[in-house]
């Protein structure tokens, strides 16, 4: 599967000057919602990501809301597991709503569309671990961390993409006066 081509085909690969959730600036942004809004593409991505973890026993898949909800669902479907999501708790962390089941000892896979620093998915992981879940792996459609994201368990992505990103003070796009778009 050519993941980058799916991003291009769906208009999900954007060029400009973007402020990422990580606080970094980048000339490129991967708008995964534009890709995942297509059920056939979403299912194909979920199947492919699920195959990377087919040998793990997974009770549930979790992702940060709202962007990861579809991804969690399609990967969980591929693995025959439950699909959960973690929401912002208003205090800088995330929580899992009542009604979404996490039993002590349940093995889980955390997924994210694009990992740059991994902070969003780490918050979802902490929420699941707080309910007794045991992390067995982290998956992403795209790893743009440059190999810097580490979770203490296997981390696998469909695509490793070297995309430049800069702290604000070192951003060449800021120096050139290119307007910044928050994403």
Curated annotation (Swiss-Prot):
Pfam families: Pribosyltran (PF00156). It is an enzyme of class 2 (transferase). It catalyses: orotidine 5'-phosphate + diphosphate = orotate + 5-phospho-alpha-D-ribose 1-diphosphate. GO terms for biological process: 'de novo' UMP biosynthetic process; pyrimidine nucleobase biosynthetic process. Its cofactor is Mg(2+). Gene3D superfamilies: 3.40.50.2020. One of its GO terms (molecular function) is magnesium ion binding. Keywords: Glycosyltransferase, Magnesium, Pyrimidine biosynthesis, Transferase. 5-phospho-alpha-D-ribose 1-diphosphate binds at residues 21, 88, 112-120. Homodimer. Belongs to the purine/pyrimidine phosphoribosyltransferase family. PyrE subfamily. This is Orotate phosphoribosyltransferase. It comes from Thermus thermophilus (strain ATCC 27634 / DSM 579 / HB8). The lineage of its organism: Bacteria, Thermotogati, Deinococcota, Deinococci, Thermales. The gene is pyrE.
């Amino acid at each position: 599967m050519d993941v980058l081509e799916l991003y291009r085909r769906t208009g999900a690969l954007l060029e400009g000057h973007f402020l990422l959730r990580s606080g970094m600036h980048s000339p490129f942004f991967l708008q995964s919602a534009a890709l995942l809004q297509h059920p056939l593409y979403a299912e194909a991505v979920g199947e492919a990501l699920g195959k990377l973890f087919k040998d793990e026993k997974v009770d549930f898949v979790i992702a940060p809301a709202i962007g990861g909800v579809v991804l969690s669902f399609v990967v969980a479907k591929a693995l025959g597991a439950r699909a959960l999501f973690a929401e912002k708790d208003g205090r800088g962390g995330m929580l899992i709503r009542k009604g979404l089941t996490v039993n002590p000892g349940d093995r889980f896979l955390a997924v994210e569309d694009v990992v740059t620093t991994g902070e969003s998915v780490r918050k979802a992981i902490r929420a699941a671990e707080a309910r007794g879940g045991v992390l067995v792996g982290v998956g992403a459609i795209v790893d743009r961390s440059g190999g810097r994201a580490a979770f203490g368990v296997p981390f696998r992505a469909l695509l490793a993409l070297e995309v430049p990103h800069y702290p604000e003070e070192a951003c060449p796009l800021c120096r050139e006066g290119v307007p910044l778009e928050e994403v």
